[in-house]
């Protein structure tokens, strides 16, 4: 019995179990910190309006960028970076990562990294899968490309892409508020988006409550 136990210990030391790839959606240790995030941009008008609001309140955010849109609007990507916001990878063509091959996913990530790096001089280190769709295998692929896989706090999905009333977006954020939340917005919307109007209400209220706005990477490192 002792020999079996010793052999088991030796085996585990020689072949340690690898940790599951991490998916980040919240950091409860980030006291009085919040990360607001925007998916699918840049958009030629919506992103600029959002950037103006963030600049007005000296708020930093994280933008998960589609490569195809970055290629079309590089000046907006550059402005976003220059104003101190974090840029994340959101694939090139908004593909659902659980529906493509590992090779195709790596190519989507690589192409988007390349164009963001070309524009800003810095490659993204965070990645958000479109639609929040993933599986363990694809999270491992994402990790192998050097990116952290970021979702959002499930209670902080504003669903602004569906163009709800402004007060609905505001209540989603304010009524479900926790330290260390990652809030999901979209800066690319073909409809009558409520996002900018909601931000003009949400940001001052969060400031009044003493919240600090940080990038996703800063939120992860907090606490």
Placement of each model-derived feature along the sequence:
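His/Asp/Glu-enriched short active-site or ligand-binding loop at hydrolase and phosphoryl-transfer sites
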Residues: 125, 133, 139-176, 210-222
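A short acidic, helix-capping loop that chelates divalent metal ions and anchors anionic groups
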Residues: 95-100, 158-160, 185
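Sec-dependent N-terminal signal peptides
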Residues: 4-13
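Short beta-strands and strand-loop turn motifs
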Residues: 35, 89-91, 151-155, 182-187
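Active-site beta->alpha N-cap acidic-glycine motif
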Residues: 20-100, 104, 108-115, 221
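C-terminal domain-boundary segment and adjacent tail
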Residues: 21-28, 57, 69-71, 193-223
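CE4/NodB-like, metal-dependent polysaccharide N-deacetylase domain
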Residues: 51-60, 64, 86, 102-136, ...
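Sec/Tat signal peptide C-region and signal peptidase I cleavage site
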Residues: 15-19
């Amino acid at each position: 019995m002792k020999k079996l136990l010793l052999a088991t210990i030796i085996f585990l030391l020689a072949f340690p179990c690898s940790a599951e790839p991490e998916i980040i959606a919240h950091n409860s240790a980030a006291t009085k910190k919040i990360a607001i995030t925007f998916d699918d941009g840049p958009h030629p008008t919506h992103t600029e309006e959002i950037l103006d609001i963030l600049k007005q309140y000296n708020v930093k955010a994280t933008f998960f960028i589609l490569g195809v849109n970055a290629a079309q609007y590089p000046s907006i990507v550059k402005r976003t970076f220059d104003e101190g916001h974090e840029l994340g990878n959101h694939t090139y063509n908004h593909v659902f990562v659980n529906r493509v091959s590992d090779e195709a996913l790596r190519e989507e990530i690589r192409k988007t990294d390349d164009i963001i790096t070309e524009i800003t001089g810095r490659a993204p280190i965070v990645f958000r899968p479109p639609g929040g769709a993933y599986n363990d295998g694809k999270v491992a692929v994402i990790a192998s490309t050097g990116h952290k896989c970021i979702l959002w706090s499930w209670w902080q999905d504003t669903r602004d892409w569906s163009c709800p009333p402004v007060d609905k977006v505001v209540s989603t954020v304010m009524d479900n508020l926790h330290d260390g939340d990652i809030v999901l917005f979209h800066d690319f919307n073909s409809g009558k988006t409520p996002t900018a109007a909601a931000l003009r209400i949400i940001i001052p209220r969060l400031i009044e409550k003493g919240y600090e706005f940080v990038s996703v990477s800063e939120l992860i490192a907090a606490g």
